[in-house]
């Protein structure tokens, strides 16, 4: 930070170095020569514009994100005495010759984004003795703008306008430098290294108290060497600062390394207070303060060195990357978030379909200890009629082979092919944990060592090297995939604890590529499996991500989080912002990873939390339970909890066709399943600001309960033609806040008027029963439509058109349900089936129970019109 602050002192001088000299129109871009360097404006699509400013250093040669090359869109350049304008069909980029700033407007001439004048900067720096720049760009941000995205963070900040962010990859935090605005645009800050958003440059001097060790305690932590008991000492720091005027101020507390406590006290009041065995190094908060003197206190691990910085809220958003080769960003514009994200994915990689079973229930714990343990657990699920599709083997199955070695120790897993076959015979799929820091003393590591494929002085492999990727996949294929493993749990892919800083990689200094390690881990596995078995869809659960990673069949989860109501609330916010970065598949450890020990099985307070968390998990893109040193099987918590969980799992499986059709919408059209309210109700400001509710698909509004002992819950219903309570059928007008019933057995779920929801039968696993009879629930009150998508459930034949679509539409004026002609075929598709048409009303067509049909029709693929 000191280096950055010193360099910033020269910024006023540098600003004059961007004076306009001339411009050149090239086939694919407009190049503007400045007093220093060249500014390139490149239209990538009609709605996506790439900006690159380069000076003396060569630009980054490796293209990690924007891998899909499109035809050059039609564009023209016009000039006035004051401006240069580059226009595509949908966007106009204007360059101000006097200030050098860019502004962006739509085809109607409305400006939706503009750079702040004199805020574009490339300041000379070095990293690992190699020259680089501190790249910085400021954008004007009007007061009525809301900003979302940047990945998954644990501080509970939803609207990111004026929030400071330190984008690094660590456990529980995922850094994705993609920002979405309520104004209808997205920005990909195209840097691969450490990035700050709204950097706070005013430092507060902190003094460590003489009696600094205020607490010493022994805790168990998960580490790259397994579970360890460590003694942790905490220190108290204090300081003071003075403000010249009242206002909102953003604070960033950066502890330097992972910690177990975020405690910031300002004027005797705790403004940030979070505890967990793993917390990211940096945390942020916006605080309103009056002018004058203020005091601060910070508590952290004694081994950490806290830095506290602040800035006053302003009408500007800033990106800064301290290890850059050029300034590089892409602006995406659209009528809505779906258009923005679809265009972004079109350039960075579309999302492949996951197998049907991946949308079912995942049973996971830390940990199963043998092949027999896994098989017997699935047998118990089947015996208890509790639906499940996936069981997961966590770490340490490697035993004698050494830490992180992807190979089953025969002591407890004597015949991997056999126990995995037994799981398959029980109609379960198997996922296994894999790490990228396998023990160098193991036989499996020999090829890595012989080819020098580890990072120097590090336990982590250099996954950037194509040879490492091939070698790594060969190890996974030989020892795991060939034995029958169905999917991958790629753990600690940050790599853990921000391990690339100051490390040399295949591409060069790791600081340049500090955020991208997880991208290459997923690439290695995805490409390897698709080559080894093109008929088996790749499914990768991974703890970290970077732009473009969505093209590799990934799911993220929120890492090793704690288990209390505040943590639950913060996961909702974390997930919503994550999903607005174009990454559609996400989950949490239902119930929290770090749990309250043996008492959790009988503690009714914890049961309340677990039950509510599980109910929310039903409506997450991926539905997975997990816990540290915990038997997470539902029956361990007693009959009441098990019964509630079973009922909610049945809801998930009855909605499976709705979910799978939404998955197709993701892959085909660039849609999103877990949808922050800004995606569908951007004109409703009250809806946009709701941090704890969202749309699941485009028809279901989900409002998780995040407080103990609750029987009703406030839900804001956006301004539409109306809403139905999913559980009761009661209808509500839009544009109001209601108190929805929230008894212990359910959370509020509202259905948008005009929705058409297909309901499958209850099943013990996906594909258990033929879908020859479906319930079609129609929610009158507005026009609506739905496309029912089906395919083989696995494999990639859908990429070549092997699937069916059945279009449904409801006409409110004529009170007619139309079922269109079936489009397409795939092997063994149903040529004839029964649709039970349910006109939803109070106490009919509600919840998990089957409704009373208004009419039953036999559908053979031909058009049907059903008049109500």
Question: Can you name each region flagged by the protein language model?
Answer:
Residues 1-21:
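Bacterial Sec-dependent N-terminal signal peptides
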Residues 18-23, 27, 42-85, 121-125:
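A low-complexity, Ser/Thr/Gly/Pro-enriched, surface-exposed linker/loop concept
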Residues 20, 60-76, 263-283, 451-454, ...:
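Solvent-exposed beta-strand/loop surfaces of large extracellular or lumenal domains
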Residues 32, 41, 51, 86-93, ...:
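Short, well-ordered beta-strand segments enriched in hydrophobic/aromatic residues
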Residues 41, 90, 178, 381, ...:
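Conserved, mostly hydrophobic/aromatic
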Residues 79-353, 365-366, 371, 378-383, ...:
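Catalytic and substrate-binding clefts that recognize carbohydrates or anionic sugar/phosphate headgroups
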Residues 273-274, 283-285, 301-306, 387-645, ...:
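Aromatic- and carboxylate-enriched substrate-binding clefts and catalytic-loop regions
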Residues 527-528, 535-538, 545-556, 578-588, ...:
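Catalytic core of carbohydrate-active enzymes
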